[in-house]
Design a protein with these regions (language model features):
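Short, basic, low-complexity termini and linkers enriched in Ser/Thr/Gly/Pro
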Residues: 1-9, 90-99, 213-225, 326-331
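Auxiliary alpha/beta "docking" domains used to position bulky ligands
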Residues: 2-195
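Generic recognition of stable, solvent-exposed alpha-helical segments in well-folded globular domains
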Residues: 10, 14, 120, 124, ...
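Iron-sulfur cluster-binding cysteine motifs and their immediate structural context
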Residues: 21, 201-216, 224-234, 240-241, ...
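Short alpha-helical functional segments enriched in proximate histidine and acidic residues
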Residues: 22, 128, 132, 205, ...
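Short, charged low-complexity linear segments at domain edges
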Residues: 166-191, 226-246, 296-301
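Long, well-ordered alpha-helical scaffolding segments within enzyme catalytic domains
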Residues: 193-198, 207
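Alpha-helical scaffold domains
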Residues: 235, 242, 246-331
Length: 331
């Protein structure tokens, strides 16, 4: 008898209940297997076209992306989780509906850093799972080389929209995705087979036209849309280093962009998050371009210490504020 045999067994329902208790809005399970060739071919073509812009790390670990078992030898199941980060609009304004000259921040970034918050919550579940049944686990929160949205579809959480976001039917796309790879064999859920249908609102609403570059009707029908990061305001304001390309118009987008989500009809009735860590911080919402342009490294580090906004670094935030200020003066 092995150590694993001496441990108690748990049911899938018990595991899903545990995940719900730590804040997961929706969960599902997919069996670990290599990613199909057509998915890998589409991804490699996207890389070949340079649509990943300066995110060269996306070129790494292709074999691991193809076969998630390389992340955890012996893995049998991928437990996919969606965590709601959305806070509805209020009279004082939000990132989606700012008041006056309020800057636009990506909604997901206004609370605590989701990497830290979600990993801490999921660790409670993986510790319980390992102690209870002796199986190994690995938590992935947006940093491991794994096709998160593909596996979320396979686990039945939702479908990938034309804006390349995972859309949960009846709830929308304002969710963080995370996974638990485990050696515990679990019954897989049925993949989600829904699509955007005839709705193309996001394609024309994208301010940088990043969603409809070289897109054929067949690609739209097959949801093989190519998002060109070189034109995406989220990439340009967060990941891009150095000066912004000529012709970029940020408007009031200081960090990220939610335009393709705001226009999506699936987000009309997005539920409010119950996770306190994702509540928008007032000290961030009230920032002006003048406040940002006056920031030094200490102020930046203190304000964004436990925030995803630190990703852009002080230089990136100063650059964005400068561009917005210059555009305001021109207009």
């Amino acid at each position: 008898m092995t150590d694993r045999d001496r441990h108690a067994t748990i049911t899938k329902d018990e595991l899903m209940a545990r995940l719900s208790s730590v804040g997961a809005y929706k969960t599902g399970v997919a069996a670990v297997r290599p990613v199909p060739d057509d998915v890998m071919n589409h991804y490699n073509e996207w890389l070949k076209r340079g649509c990943h812009a300066g995110m060269t790390y996306l070129e790494n670990h292709l074999e691991i992306r193809r076969n998630p078992e390389l992340l955890l030898p012996g893995a049998k199941s991928i437990i996919c989780c969606a965590f709601n980060y959305y806070t509805p609009p209020s009279d004082s304004g939000t990132p989606e509906k700012p008041v006056g000259n309020q800057l636009k921040w990506a909604c997901y970034a206004l609370g605590d850093d989701y990497h830290e918050a979600i990993r801490e919550r999921l660790s409670k579940v993986t510790s319980w799972l390992t102690e209870t049944c002796g199986h190994e686990c690995r938590i992935c929160v947006d940093t491991a080389p794994i096709f998160e949205r593909y596996w979320a579809v396979q686990a039945g959480l939702g479908f990938i929209g034309l804006n390349r976001q995972l859309i949960i039917p009846g709830a929308g796309s304002r969710f963080f995705l995370a996974e638990i790879l485990t050696t515990l064999p679990l019954e897989a859920d049925s993949p989600c087979t829904l699509s955007c249908g005839s709705c193309h609102r996001c394609l024309n609403h994208c301010p940088g036209h990043a969603l409809n570059t070289q897109t054929s009707k067949l690609e739209i029908q097959n949801s093989k849309l190519c998002l060109d990061a070189r034109k995406c305001l989220s990439y340009l304001t967060i990941e891009h280093r150095g000066d912004l390309p000529d012709g970029v118009k940020l408007g009031s987008h200081i960090y990220g962009c939610d335009e393709c989500q705001d226009i999506c009809p699936h987000n009309c009735n997005s539920p409010a998050t119950t996770i306190t860590e994702f509540t928008p911080r007032p000290e961030i919402l009230k920032l002006t371009t003048a406040d940002i342009l006056a920031m030094d490294r200490h102020t930046f580090s203190t304000l964004f210490c436990h925030s995803a906004i630190k990703r852009t670094k002080l230089a990136g935030l100063l650059r964005n504020a400068t561009y917005i200020t210059q555009l305001t003066h021109i207009n």
